[in-house]
Structures are given as C-alpha cells and as structure tokens.
C-alpha cells in the first residue's frame, strides 16, 4: 500500500487563509499528492470553506465532542482535488471575523474549546472513516492542531504523528481550569503546564513522534533562549526528533509569465512586462507614474514581529534621504500600526501609499510592480513573502534571521560570490539598520546591469515544492517503514524553472548565478553540527 497522510490545520488555501500557514498547507498537500501519496486535509468547517468544498457529503457523525455534536464532511479542494475533511460544528466555527479573531480583532473567548474539539475530531478520523482508510501518519500544524498527537496516543491508534511548528510564538496557552471541559486527562494537563497555564503547543512538542519546522536557521534558533519563547528546554530535550524542511511556494500560483492579475506577463529573460506592472501599481496607488523612481514595497503583517514599529521610524528617514523614492504598503495587523502607516502616507501623498487590508490581487500586483521589498522581522520561521517577491524580480531587503538567512543571498556576504546574490540583509532592530540596508540597495538600483543580475538570480532560483516534498517523503518513510512507497517515487522528476542561457544585457557583469535551491540540506560555514539522512536534516545540540 502507499502512505496515507492526514494534514490537520486551521487553514489551507484556497478554503481558508490568513497567512503563510494557509499557503503552506494547501500547496504542500498538493505537491505530496502529485508525488503519489494519499493526502487528506482536515480543517474546521468555516462557512467560506464549506461553500468552496467540491462534492461534499457527510462522512461521519461525532456526537460526543467537547462543545457539542458535530459532523465530518468529506469533499475535495476546488483546484487540486485533494480530499478534504471539514468539521461541521456551526456553534464553534460559523462566526464573523477570521478563524481566530472576532470582528473587533480580539481572540474568540472559546478558542481553547474550538480547537480542542477540532483536535478530538481529527484524532477520531485518524483511525479511518467511511470512504477513507485509516491513516499511517497525521501531520498537525501549529498550536490549533497540537493536541492531536496526544489524543492519538491516548486512543491507542497505531498512527505516527508529526507536529509542524510554523511560528513558535503562537502557543495556545490557556488557564488549566478549563482543561476539564476539553476532554483531556489531568496528567496530560499537568505535563503540558507552561508557566501556570496549559499549552496546546507544548503538548504537541511532547507527544509528537517528530517535530518539524520550516527552515534550517529557525530550527537552530528555537533551541536558544533568545528565540525559544519559553519552549527551548522542551525542544532541546527533543532535538534528535527535530527536523528542518524549508517551505516552498506554489510556482503555478506565483508565476509572472502566467499571472492573470497582470496586464502583461514577464519572465527572467524579458522584464518589459514588469515595467508595465510598475506603472499599473503606481496607477492603482495614485502615485506619480515614474518608471525610474525606485518603488519600495512593504507587504507583510503590520505587527511587532514584522518590525512595523521600526519601519514607521525608518520610512521617514528613507523618504528624506532619497527624494525619488516611492513607498507602497499593503497589509493589516495591529490597529495602532495600521493607523500610523495610513497617517504617514497621508503626510506624503505623492511619495507613499498605504492600503490597509489584504487581497490576492493586490499582493500579486505589489510583488510584480515594486522594485524592492522591505521585510523586517524580529524572528522569521520561513518568510514566504520575499520568495514571492524574488519570483517576480523584486529584490528583498530583509532582516538576517530565521528562514530569511536560508533563502536570501546577501549581496554583501562572501557566500554571495559563490551562489549569486539575490538581495540585502541587515542585522538588528533599529531604524538606522533598516534605512541603511535600503540605502545600500538603492546604490545598486542606479546600476542597471548590476541590479538586473540580482533580479535574474532571484527569478531563476527554484523555491518550488519539489525539494520540500521529497524531504517530507523521506521523513514519512522513517516513521512508517512498513508502508510500501509507490515505485514511481524513486524517479519522480524535480521541477525546475526555465531560464535563458544568461541574463539579457548582463553577460559582461561577472558570472551568472549558479543554479541553487537553498533548502534544509544546505550547509554554510556557520552551520551548527547537523546529521543528514534520507534527504532531511536533523537538528542536534
């Protein structure tokens, strides 16, 4: 038989998305399905998800869940056909707002109950439901599904579990007194205690058979006091079970040569369509149409993690120091940062525009039309936004943390001479460091041939899902060795992006970037000791 894998997550594109978690779950499931695995995604039954579910029918009833009876619906993704299970529990998931926050931006008061019920349902489904066989492996994503490994083991199911940590800062910590309403054994509540609270995430870290995270550098960082968010001791104890697999992006969705949101397609060998996209973006944002003005984009959540506070101090410095600079902000997050960004744009109406909110159309137009992407972050598990930007020839200026270290080759580093620079990294959390990195980038921007090499290197680097999918396959094989892999997996071709022989108009400017893909298998001179086996990297102390 082939492997049967159940993804359990709070979001997955296209059914539900608030950020990178949704992108990863949907795209990774599709990639594994193309690799020949039987992958099923289980999500809460949000109304929008149910409306998009294809060929929906009732798979089973669950009368005894915490929070009341519910049904499990079985259907398929509308785009990839990946099987989907939705927990149909209207009292828990039929609400205004997003999956986690109410219409006022506050966490739902019963989030513990909502996601405990979801985890109980997933643990039941793991044993098999009508029309679906029992699963070999259950992969839970972030704290919302982190109770699943505990509940699977408590039920005695012969299923291996993986917990993928997308962001260690989000832990699902709640008062232990509510645990009795969540259907959890008292001893588990005690063992997963976390500074006087019960932690969903800690429970997952303790009971999962393997723990994965989404970049090599972040996997090492979370073992330290600086980035461990209180979980570092648990992670150090499980370090031999910690695996780093870099996230990919969906090259079919993020494809400038076939992007329906753009007026003209473009590719690495011909950027005329990108010039058109810049004018299109300037028109949308009511900025002066100027093909020569450097256009800096900020397209991330407006939060403390993403250094929105630092950007608010650095942007006025940049606008003053660089009279031609234009700034485009697309994002949402904490209300104070949203208001401050909007106010800053109002003070510079012909230099800066801020669109508070997020749509896929605007995100595609931003990455296609901008020249540079500013991506500050105090910590960054992976960092998908710069990968989207590089795919569209937009050069990232980013913090030197987490997955950004693994995916952006800093033009100022010795390593860039070997693997081809793709952007600019800065250290620290000060406005001066951020503004200085942008200034460094702008000095290269006025050198068209050198800038073109940066764009070319980024656009021709393959950050698709082929390599990460192969690493997940290797991980699953170690967990379920008795499951027979499908024969064609050994010969599954790695997808690569088409690229011209050399960057147009840049042949004299040094050597074109060597083809690379920075993954969990990459090593650098600064890398900690690692053990690599079967296409994956285990993080050791």
From Swiss-Prot:
CDD domains: GT5_Glycogen_synthase_DULL1-like. ADP-alpha-D-glucose binds at residue 17. Its EC number is 2.4.1.21. It comes from the Bacteria. Residues 497-541 are annotated as: Disordered. GO terms for biological process: glycogen biosynthetic process. GO terms for molecular function: alpha-1,4-glucan glucosyltransferase (ADP-glucose donor) activity; alpha-1,4-glucan glucosyltransferase (UDP-glucose donor) activity. It is an enzyme of class 2 (transferase). NCBIfam families: glgA (TIGR02095), PRK00654.1-2 (NF001899). This is Glycogen synthase. It comes from Ralstonia nicotianae (strain ATCC BAA-1114 / GMI1000). The lineage of its organism: Bacteria, Pseudomonadati, Pseudomonadota, Betaproteobacteria, Burkholderiales.
């Amino acid at each position: 038989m082939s492997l049967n894998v159940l993804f359990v997550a709070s979001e997955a594109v296209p059914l539900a998305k608030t950020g990178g978690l949704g992108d990863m779950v949907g795209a990774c499931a599709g990639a594994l399905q193309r690799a020949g695995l039987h992958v099923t995604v289980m999500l809460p039954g949000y109304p929008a998800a149910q409306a998009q579910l294809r060929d929906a029918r009732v798979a089973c009833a669950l009368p005894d869940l915490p929070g009341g009876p519910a049904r499990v619906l079985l259907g398929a993704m509308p785009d990839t056909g990946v099987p989907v299970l939705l927990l149909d529990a209207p009292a828990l998931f039929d609400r205004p707002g997003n999956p986690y926050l109410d219409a006022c931006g506050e966490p739902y008061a019963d989030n513990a109950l909502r996601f405990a019920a979801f985890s109980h349902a997933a643990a039941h489904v793991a044993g098999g439901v009508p029309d679906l066989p029992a699963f070999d492996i259950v992969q839970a994503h972030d704290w919302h599904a982190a109770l699943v490994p505990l509940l699977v083991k408590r039920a005695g199911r012969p299923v291996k579990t993986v917990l993928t940590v997308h962001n260690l800062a989000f832990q699902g910590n709640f008062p232990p007194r509510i645990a009795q309403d969540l259907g959890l054994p008292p001893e588990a509540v005690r063992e997963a205690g976390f500074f006087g609270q019960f932690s969903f995430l800690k429970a997952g870290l303790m009971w999962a058979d393997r723990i994965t995270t989404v970049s090599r550098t972040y996997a090492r960082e979370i073992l330290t006091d600086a980035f461990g968010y209180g979980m570092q001791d648990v992670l150090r104890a499980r370090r031999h079970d910690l695996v780093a697999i870099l996230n990919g992006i969906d090259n079919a969705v993020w494809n400038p040569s076939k992007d329906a949101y753009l007026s003209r397609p473009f590719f690495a060998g011909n950027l005329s369509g990108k010039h058109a996209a810049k004018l299109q973006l300037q028109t949308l944002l009511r900025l002066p149409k100027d093909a020569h003005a450097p256009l800096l984009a900020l397209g991330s959540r407006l939060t403390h993690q993403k250094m929105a506070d630092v950007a608010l101090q650095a942007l006025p410095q940049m606008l003053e120091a660089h009279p031609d600079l234009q700034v485009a902000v697309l994002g949402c997050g904490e209300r104070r940062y949203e208001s401050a960004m909007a106010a800053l744009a109002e003070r510079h109406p012909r230099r800066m525009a801020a669109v508070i909110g997020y749509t896929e159309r605007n995100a595609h137009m931003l990455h296609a039309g901008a020249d540079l992407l500013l991506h500050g972050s105090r910590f960054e598990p992976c960092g998908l936004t710069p990968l989207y930007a590089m795919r569209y020839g937009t050069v990232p200026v980013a913090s030197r943390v987490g997955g950004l270290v693994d995916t952006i080759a800093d033009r100022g580093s010795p390593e860039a001479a070997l693997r081809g620079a793709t952007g600019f990294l800065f250290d620290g959390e000060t406005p001066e460091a951020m503004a200085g990195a942008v200034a460094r980038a702008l000095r290269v921007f006025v050198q068209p041939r050198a800038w073109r090499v940066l764009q070319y290197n980024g656009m021709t680097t393959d950050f698709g899902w082929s390599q990460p999918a192969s690493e997940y396959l290797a991980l699953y094989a170690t967990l379920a060795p008795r499951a027979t892999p499908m024969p064609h997996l050994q010969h599954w071709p790695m997808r690569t992006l088409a690229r011209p022989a050399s960057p147009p108009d840049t042949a004299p400017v040094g050597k074109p970037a060597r083809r690379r893909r920075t993954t969990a298998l990459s090593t650098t001179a600064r890398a900690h000791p690692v053990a690599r086996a079967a296409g994956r990297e285990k993080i050791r102390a």
